Amino acid sequence: MRVTKGNDHLKVKAVAGTRVVLLAFDMDEGSREGLLGFAVKRGVKGHEQTWLRGTKYFRDLVPHPHPKDDYSSREQPFQTFLWSDYKAFADTDYDFTIVALYGDIHAFEERHTLEFSIRTEAEDDQHHGVWFNRGAIASHAFETKFHNKRLTEEMTDNVSDDGKLLDPETEWLSRGLAEACLKYINETGPGEGLRVCAYEFTYLPILRALKRALDRGVDVQIVYHDTKKDDDANRAAIGKAELPDKVVHGGQETQVLFRRTRTPIPHNKFIVKLVGGKPKRVWTGSTNFTDTGFFGQTNVGHLVTDADTAKIYLDYWAELSGDPTHSIALKNATGLTPNPPNVIAKKSIAAFFSPRIADNMLDWYGQRITDTTTLAMMTIPFNVAKTILAALGKKRDAMRLVVLEDVPAAEVTAAEKANRGKLAFSNGAILGKSFIKYKVGGAKVVPIANSDLDEWFVEEELARPTNNGHVFFIHSKVLLIDPLSDDPLICSGSANFSTNSLTSNDENMLLIRGNTRVADIYMTEVDRIFRHFRSRDIINHIAEEGEHNKWLELDTTGAWIGPNFKEGNYKNNRRQLFFPEADVGTWSDQAAADPNPFADEKERAAAKKKKKPPQG
């Protein structure tokens, strides 16, 4: 939901997702002098409002701060023109009061007060359900709330049969994601069906929920990745959950488990639900069925209630259940989901399955980035593909904000510098520490030497083990095009934005056009993740240079305001996203005139085939 409110001096644009309410402010030039910040008050509709809190303070008012302390925004205002409330609940009506504070910090003067109401989105409106986990496992909040408690298998597996997470740490990290997946399985009744396609399939509460579904008469069939190794983790978990290879219902034997062995990365993570023998819903997204998927790295679960979409996924599942060779899998994926047009139909959902003969879909994504008129946002778990970087790096008026798993490569940093103020990257980070990955998997965490960060901030730690794995922070695969417009494009699913993902793996993506509710949820969440890591990237970089800073002290001089209204500045460009001076249209206006990105698909595939070394 979106709300705009204003007077002659102050404007606010509020965007509500499910668990985030984003607030953007704009101030008339004549009212900026002497502005000390904004106080924000919020309450459930019809109930008392309370001042929201932050961690920054005026030194004169807080001479002896503690890193764990927070402060009322009425006493220590927010000195920013973009602020988000991360403690909202889904499907709830809220009243907000925004007050601009001026004068003496010992006796603030309130001016230009604005009041408005907004409703957060329901997690599932019976068309699209969207759940993002916390995705910020190393954070100020996790330390102050749970003292950086290390996650254990006992904690993550502590789940009731009805799908409630009984451990407070895992419940906080899940943020409804694991619960939604468990509920989806648990609500399936006798005679209904579930078709599971799983890459990593080791989170026992999910497997046990599927076993209980079998026991109550649900037709459960599972395609899972089998490496054929003796210590295969999926097979071990299946054994622990006592999921049978076959079952007998009404005297008829039915296969339950189907091994996927003929591709190195069968990367899907979806579950189709059948009612009355017909596909009705599909759970998909980026979340592997693992404890790390639900409680560690950033992930999204996306539930679509649409018979046509569910049918396409069911047909895909049926093809994969036969463990096809690469050539057959490629033919099946292309047959089920032909290459999309540059402009998919209004108010539509299109699926896109892999493998494909070539990586031209990267060109399609790149064109959509270039077509963006206001804002493009991405989450990229691995390297930035050259095609994607070329699109991101083009000189454009639109802003481009990208969250990476790893520290940007030199060419990524160069693109950012060439588009300063318009293109910005953030990457997975732990405040005050360097995170060094090993190529074979795992990582080591090293404190930044000679920094004073421990005087200002609590110590953040990654609550999951670092001795194995390749993705610790960002695992979602999301592309948002003009998400603040009335015609947004949302791309989300299992597929990394890479050549291998397109040409080698089993993958699925959803392309969703024109759904502003879904766009608001995704935008507020990707913005949350982007800003969480960007602040840590910046602070760590400055600390590594040996600089010291008064990190949490508020400004009494008014200098904080200037960058928000300086032409070309990142903060000014960000503010203007919410208060545009003119209507610039949307991505679809330009996309219709773009060339066909798949025109050379066969030639590209043939060239790739020639480059392959001879076998044997």
Map each language-model feature to its residues.
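PLD/PLD-like phosphodiesterase catalytic module centered on the HKD motif
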Residues: 1-167, 178, 182, 190-192, ...
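Beta-propeller domains
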Residues: 337-412
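Short, compositionally biased low-complexity segments enriched in polar/charged residues
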Residues: 172-187, 202
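Well-ordered alpha-helical segments embedded in enzymatic catalytic cores
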Residues: 176-180, 205, 360-364
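Glycine- and acidic
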Residues: 166-167, 191-196, 373-377
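Aspartyl protease catalytic domain
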Residues: 138, 143-167, 172, 312-367
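Gly/Ser/Thr-rich loops at beta-strand to alpha-helix junctions
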Residues: 199-203, 382-384
